[in-house]
Amino acid sequence: MDANKPSYLGLLNAIALGEGRAHQYLSCWAAKTTDPDVKKVLQTVAIREGEHSHAFTKRLCELGFGVLDRPDPSFDKNMAIANADCSDLEKFEALGFGQREERDPFTKVFDDLTIDIRTGELLGRYIAEERDSGRMLRGCYQVLRERAGRGRGADASARDLSDLHHRLDEICAAIGKLQQEVTALRR
């Protein structure tokens, strides 16, 4: 790697591309929805995504580099979903909402200690806005699920039962370990 080339250029490039593409399909979906509440959320998030794309493109330029286009195999699929003649709830689910949430994808961003101050500020704002956008989209999805009679109640019961089973397994394992320790102490 070039000694003058920042180690985080790939990250900035990926954000610029991903956010620009998200802006496109969310804008398409916002134009197509007939629900004013969904439209408001989608427009807000789409505007943020577009602004992020421009801000990271600008930062790459300030660092003396440009955006390198990389293919995104999911982009055409996401555009087709956004433009589909189906419900907003179906679009959310086709885009992966309702699946088990993964860990926060941003926790490792600042592990690179070479990130300069201006880039760090930009990344910090980006992460805060992405987390907020995620909350907005998940909230919108939940409202649509509740309207469709598939709200939190059913999910909560299944999740609570799963959590209860997991905790019982942990308790049984702890009891087994304690029994072994007591037996060992008696010897």
Where on the chain are the PLM-derived regions?
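Non-heme di-metal
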Residues: 1-187
